Amino acid sequence: MKLFITTSGIGSRLGDLTKFTNKSMIKIGKKPVISYIIDEYPKDIEIVVSLGYYGDHVKQYLELAYPDRNITFVEVDNYAGPGSSQVYSQLCAEQYLQEPFIYHDCDTMIDNLQAQIPMNFDHNFIVGYETNAELYDAFDFDATQNNKVIKTYMKPDSLEGMAAYVGIVGVYDYETFWKNLNKAYREITYTAPHDFMVYHKYQMFANNLRAYIVDNWTDTGNVASVKEARKKCKDSFQILDKIDQGIFMIGNQVIKFFAKDGVVDNLMYHYKYIADFCGPIKQHTKNFIVYDYIDGEDAIKGMNPERFNKMLKYFHENYLWNKVNCIDTEYFNVCKDRFYIDKTLDRINHFKSYYNITEDKDIYVNDVLIPKEYTIENMLQEFRQFDEYKNTVPTNWHGDFVLDNMLVKDGEFILLDWREKFDDIIPFGDRNYDFAKMNHNLTFNFSSACRELFNISEKDDHIYVSILADNYVLACRETLKDFVETYYDVSYPYINFITGLCWVNMSPLHMLNPVCKLLFYMGKLTMYQSLLAMKA
């Protein structure tokens, strides 16, 4: 008996969630959906996985996460456009499934599955869930006749007295299954056929189809259900997810995903310069980095000004921010402009277009007037004129230097995240950016953001924003101010301006999360107030 999972489809109902990767790779809690599926089956089961849309992501991930599993990958040559369909994707795997198997949709999560359906069987079965939702294909069954399926329905108006089809089928009569799928592929030309349509149209297994009703079901096939699943998931950690990146925890491994090709190569090149400050990397592929889980304490826990000062001095004394001289100054300045100015404008223009926001009138943020002349673009141009910007110092580290991405173990601080490059410069960055990111984290932390412990309200031209922060952590801002001014001769308002700039840059990265507007307006307010302080 085998397990068959199709991952070849484009996931069109999921919008931006599948813009950069496959729908089976959507993260719920600590894992992608496909891991929740595989982890419900016996470890010795043979698995067949069809690959299509971003199939290489799926293949790389499964080979890293399940090196001891017996997985056969099947390439689907046509997964989008004319002639593509779920049925065609299934048919591509026909030669590998000439025995009984379980078919499991890649957007169906069910807890405690082995206790609810058989892993070895001598009959065909279909799996359902009792719900009042009206989005699903369905069937009814006779509980007095060993749960025999009576009739199937294509998206009925009401599911009363029926069970919704969850996307799991046990195929015992596999020859009949493949015969009907091939027939459907030839005959159903008016639409893209899918598996349930075949069961319904041809009454497949009409006299030998049993129903199993599960007591839970998470459908991750649409945006609303993904959001709901993420809220309910107890097996999670606090991080703001991005649609083109992911961090998964599988056993004692941490697997980081980067959708864009080339990012991992750049990260690994940068890593050579900063490895002493980071944990050891176990392996990497084109789109993934793997390291063992580090059993340390989150740096943000119990943070206070005294511990914070110790942490800053630790990195200072270990030369994290020492100036590097092996770079052309003129080229560094060109990259600096692209990083701070051009990238910011590109991102906020996308954000403003998405939310139909203009900057052509005065606004009040937390009762502070921001005149219309102080657009983000105008403030960036003023920012460029300050001596601190002109005299930016390149250093080895360039990354997400925040407490949320830092561990403490045996008296040492371990950095978990670094950036691939500073614009086009791979191994170097601007230390003021690191200080600004730390400053950001003292106010804006993953815990409050992920638990939605923030507020934003908009009424006419008045916007109010706030986020819950730890008083002891907030108090560290004064420590940071003293540190940067004493050791690096840079003013705190300048650092604070870059913090605001970071927030407006973050806003379009989280447009599926209400935190995006908080970041935009909090960022603009911080930039404005910091600019006034710098000019005072």
Where are these regions (language model features)?
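N-terminal nucleotide-binding beta1-loop-alpha1 segment
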Residues: 1-19
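Conserved alpha/beta core of the MobA/IspD/sugar-nucleotide pyrophosphorylase nucleotidyltransferase superfamily
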Residues: 3, 162-244, 249
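Conserved core of the sugar-phosphate nucleotidyltransferase
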Residues: 110-188
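Active-site Asp-x-Gly
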Residues: 161, 409-465
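Helix-rich C-terminal or lid/interface subdomains of diverse kinases
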Residues: 222, 310-311, 345-359, 436-437, ...
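ATP-binding glycine-rich loop module of kinase domains
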Residues: 240-268, 292-293, 299-303
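Conserved kinase catalytic-core helix
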Residues: 273-277, 299-368, 372-390, 394-395, ...
